[in-house]
Regions:
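N-terminal intrinsically disordered/low-complexity leader segments
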Residues: 1-25, 199-212
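Helix-turn-helix
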Residues: 30, 34, 38-72, 76
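Alpha-helical structural segments
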Residues: 30-37, 72-87, 100-107, 131-138
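Short, amphipathic alpha-helical "lid/cap" segments that border enzyme active or binding sites
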Residues: 32, 95, 219-230
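Amphipathic alpha-helical segments used for helix-helix packing
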Residues: 78, 106-135, 166-176, 203-206
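Hydrophobic alpha-helical connector segments
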Residues: 86-131, 147-150, 154-157
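Hydrophobic alpha-helical bundle segments that form small-molecule/ligand-binding pockets
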Residues: 132-188, 233-236
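Amphipathic C-terminal alpha-helical segment
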Residues: 159-174, 193-216, 231-236
């Protein structure tokens, strides 16, 4: 519950250690790594001050000396994930570079399935996220557009990637929980849908199915969605 009258604080503006007293037993990187291990193994809901403290081998209350709020813990985790972005020398083709960024972000989110839940603008200015954004802007250097437009483009690409990965993760989680195989369910649902489309009540859907050449290529859809966003930002 929010405390009225509390003063907002950015975790990155808070000194990791003061000039006095003994050296802290843990760094922010240590704490972030412990939280990431828990989230990777058991999901984001398993991340708590108590569980992170246990992972580090310290008392829960002592952890608050490093991380005042759970929200700060999430921000450390998001920054730790951003540190995994590979930052390359841009090739000079802004479309190719931004597509590479998008594919890498998708891989990163699959590596850390909890990450889409932390994709918030609030966490957008942590140290490693700033390096990532600076890299994206370097990739977009050849694009004749304002920096505001370029940041908008980066946000739109990240939004598409995040939404796509969320759907992939949700589908995979649901499939694991099914009491039957995905193929069995697809066959039953497909038969039902075919009957509905053949009823004549949905002529446009019938036409859409008639022109379909086969199963949807989800990889191609991902690439196409991104390409169409980039098309919108091509200089006219």
């Amino acid at each position: 519950m929010a405390v009225r009258g509390a003063v907002p604080e950015v975790i990155w503006a808070r000194p990791e250690r003061t000039g006095r007293g003994p050296k802290p037993a843990y760094t922010r990187d240590d704490i972030a790594a412990a939280a990431v291990r828990i989230a990777d193994a058991r999901g984001l809901d398993a991340v708590s001050m108590r569980h992170v403290a246990a992972e580090l081998g310290c008392g829960t209350m002592s952890l608050y000396n490093y991380v005042p709020r759970k929200e700060d813990l999430y921000e450390l985790m998001a920054d730790a994930a951003a540190a995994e972005h590979v930052l390359w020398e841009p090739c000079g083709d802004w479309r190719a570079d931004l597509m590479r960024v998008a594919r890498q972000t998708r891989e990163l989110m699959h590596r850390h399935p909890w990450l889409p839940r932390l994709m918030s603008p609030v966490y957008g200015f942590s140290p490693h996220t700033l390096r990532y954004l600076e890299h994206c802007l370097a990739c977009l250097e050849p694009l004749a557009a304002s920096y505001g437009t370029k940041l908008e483009l980066i946000a739109m690409v990240n939004g598409v990637v995040t939404t796509y990965v969320r759907n992939e993760l949700d589908s995979a989680q649901r499939a694991r929980a099914l009491p039957w195989s995905e193929a069995e369910e697809a066959a039953v649902r497909g038969a039902y849908l075919a009957r509905q489309v053949a009823s004549g009540a949905y002529p446009r859907m019938a036409a859409a199915f008639a022109e379909a050449s086969g199963p949807v290529d989800l990889e191609a859809v991902f690439e196409r969605a991104l390409a169409r966003i980039l098309d919108a930002y091509e200089p006219r």
